[in-house]
């Protein structure tokens, strides 16, 4: 510790305060000539001292110093150099996961804060923010060397690192800490900058830790940056987290945005030119620019609002920066004179700032080509605040100080920010630490409420949610079977709106056929509840149509005096379904039930498939004899597999694993005397090997007539006509689809599975690439089972 103190004394900053008062004892003022000479000497000494000060700044600090000087030209940065040396010495033996010296992290955090325009005290705290937690440097020693203010900031960041938002057991700790931070928000700003650099270098951590940190960033840190008004930091945190948590979806969004770039840029250039021309004619000085696109925001709008990519307005956005507030309102008039404003889309955040920080005018108009165009209009000062939030706010407060040094009471002035005031109000009003913690955590989620299950679990819902929304948030089946609700111990109507902090209990029906009511669609507000209810009724209609179709087919076959079970078998119906352009047999039955095709027509196609009534009767009789069935093997049934020592034995490729040439295979003798061919890694291998006497060797022997069953799975961002585009891509490659299934998850990811026959599996790689190029598809691969 003594060595540290010695270093600190050697690097004690030279205080340079301009004006004659400092040099008065050395400056005679008897004559004008003498005074002029003395002034030259003072300037020379000041120049030498400033040169000496600059020479003590480490080269690695020069970028930070250059940025900070833009905001605080007269700042004395000697203390920053001293903090860097202490941090460098304390972290000397430590490395980051990337292999870089640990000091690169606090230095990067300080650089981020310098770019935000934070004061010297914050930069010093940033350089030292990990020394107390990760080295033997005590908080007392740090405070003694750099002052109580720096010590307070470092202590706040250290405590924030030691707790996990959301743990009720830590409620009291977080309550005290957040209250302290509300009085000095720089602690929060340092933490946000710390997380931003960690997210930028997250690739060096294990995947599971990356995912945990990214999830915490999305749920807590990014909303915190949003509440602090730090938009530029918030966007970057969200996009970095998105790339870690959903890499394939992230890449697909990036690809989609890049694909629209040329047409979008042309469109924006046309819009900018028109706005600039009209503003000039109206004598309004302003800068017009395109707004950057943020991938997480685009993805969220696709999920939460259920929009297709092409319908997202944010892809085309304009920002107008004016000199004066009155010009902002005049600019709105200009924009509305050019294009028709959309009803309900004008918001005045200048008159009513959001969170007490953000100010801007928002409007959406029907722009050229009938496309929605989002426009933000603000002053340049408002724009700096919008980008840097409380950091910019703090910078303006600091401007009242001297040489960038914090005014002792400046922190109190931050209390004019609404959200910071709210934190202090919660501290006073919350009866329990857990109550305060919940107020903090869930207020970070804009336009959401939190309610509790009977067991005390927290469920977050959109504002205006009902018990039905709550039921679906708990589980889909709870939602489907919901018949009543009790809120805070009292029975309530299902359409009653829930409020923050309420305890909700759902009563469910035990009836096997229980389901949602169509009336629910009129009052539920959560996307999940709306989707699940809509899916239930769609599935119910499909199931009813499917059963009606089967009944109609049975009646029609019996009317013709034909054997139902033998005629309506999977192979024959699948052939007719393909001929009539249905993706599978179930779709054909559903079409019959819905009246799109008649049962009589389908039976006629079945008979034609079998060569007429006479041939059909003969064919059906032949199928009924197992021995005849084994002998019957047309050339088109060549599966490309031979059994050594047993030529002519009927072989069949197992549908449970759909082997193709190149796969390791094994044979299993069926009870009918044929051989079922499985992949050696088939999910049924373990059970088959329990009957080892029935396992035989088989070899691939494909010929030009061999046909193989292949199943692929396609994962894509759901959109209109997605299935059509995928099936069209397969059809263009002359692929005959035997079956297809599609499911859509709550986050608008469509998972499709297709089963088809291929003559040469070597072409599968090319086929997968073709499907992968369909818009919205981010992954496609072969799967084992065709079922």
Curated annotation (Swiss-Prot):
Family: Belongs to the RelA/SpoT family.
Biological role stated in the UniProt entry: In eubacteria ppGpp (guanosine 3'-diphosphate 5'-diphosphate) is a mediator of the stringent response that coordinates a variety of cellular activities in response to changes in nutritional abundance. This enzyme catalyzes the formation of pppGpp which is then hydrolyzed to form ppGpp.
Protein's GO biological process: guanosine tetraphosphate biosynthetic process
Pathway linked to the protein: Purine metabolism; ppGpp biosynthesis; ppGpp from GTP: step 1/2
SUPFAM superfamilies: ACT-like, HD-domain/PDEase-like, Nucleotidyltransferase, TGS-like
Keywords: ATP-binding, GTP-binding, Kinase, Nucleotide-binding, Transferase
Sequence ranges of Polar residues compositional bias: 1-12
Residues of the HD domain: 102-199
CC terms in the record's Gene Ontology section: plasma membrane
Domain ACT: from-to ranges: 711-785
Catalytic activity, EC: 2.7.6.5
Domain TGS residues, every copy: 447-508
Catalytic reaction annotation: GTP + ATP = guanosine 3'-diphosphate 5'-triphosphate + AMP
A Pfam family: HD_4
Residues making up the signal peptide according to the UniProt record: none
Protein name listed in UniProt: Probable GTP pyrophosphokinase
Enzyme's top EC category: transferase
Keyword GTP-binding: yes
PROSITE patterns named in the record: ACT (PS51671), HD (PS51831), TGS (PS51880)
UniProt xrefs under InterPro entries: ACT-like_dom_sf (IPR045865), ACT_dom (IPR002912), Beta-grasp_dom_sf (IPR012675), HD/PDEase_dom (IPR003607), HD_domain (IPR006674), NT_sf (IPR043519), RelA/Spo_fam (IPR004811), RelA/SpoT_AH_RIS (IPR045600)
Region (Disordered): 1-40, 618-641
